[in-house]
A protein has these predicted regions:
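N-terminal start-of-chain detector that recognizes signal peptides
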Residues: 2-4, 45-46, 61-63, 130-134, ...
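Short, well-ordered beta-strand elements
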Residues: 3-6, 30
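C-terminal cap of thioredoxin/glutaredoxin-like
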Residues: 8, 14-27, 102-206
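Structural alpha/beta surface segment adjacent to cysteine/selenocysteine redox centers
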Residues: 10, 14-107, 191-206
Length: 206
């Protein structure tokens, strides 16, 4: 059975939707929380919520898609929000699957304020994590390492899977991932090799 690293950020609605589809993936999942903003900075990208028209589309699409999949879903009271404390909470919990799911659900199911300090403190108590544990250097270092590792592996967005040297980005890439796991030649055929070295014919002026 394959072991897959799953990179996610709690700020991402796509990560939440993907979480609820992980049982479709044949393999052992290693949960790797990362700071999406750090990946955006690394690659010089703009987040989808930073472009007004794209922001509205993303919110509408995710709401509709989650409904189609039968996933309980409601955007928090304000978005984007700062996910740093939630990411550290996941790490302090050892990134256990049930803890990751509980954190995601607390953000994406009730339409509440994800940045509310009292709600977050209640969540920490529920998961048995103290403020001191959240602010430990070990927790901070692991989040930084995860984000740096993701960037070094070519991860540019969340959610992303990494397996056998390949990145599969997006909650909608699970079918592609499953095809690769069933037959690695999916990414090793002649056309895929051609795409890897496809020349650039024009570059947009900055």
């Amino acid at each position: 059975m394959a072991s897959l690293d799953w990179y996610f950020d709690f700020v991402s609605p796509y990560s939440y939707i993907c979480l609820h589809r992980l049982d479709e993936v044949p393999g052992s999942i290693v949960y790797k929380p990362v700071l999406f903003a750090g990946l955006l900075n690394h690659w010089g990208q703009t987040g989808p919520a930073e472009i007004p028209a794209k922001r509205q589309w993303t919110y509408r699409w995710c709401t509709w898609w989650a409904g189609e999949l039968g996933i309980a879903f409601r955007f928090p009271a304000a978005h984007p929000f700062n996910p740093l404390h939630h990411l550290r909470l996941s790490i302090a919990c050892g990134n256990r699957a049930e803890a990751v799911r509980r954190i995601f659900d607390s953000i994406w199911q009730g339409g509440e304020d994800a940045g509310d300090a009292q709600r977050f403190a209640t969540l920490c108590r529920e998961l048995g994590i103290s403020e001191k544990m959240l602010s430990s250097q070990e927790v901070k270092d692991e989040l930084r390492r995860n984000t740096e590792q993701a960037a070094a592996r070519g991860v540019f967005g969340v959610p992303s899977f990494f397996v056998d040297g390949e990145v599969f980005w997006g909650a909608d890439a699970i079918g592609f991932l499953k095809a690769f796991l069933a037959d690695p030649a999916t990414l090793r055929n002649e056309e895929m090799r051609r795409l890897a070295s496809l020349p650039v014919a024009a570059v947009r002026k900055s």
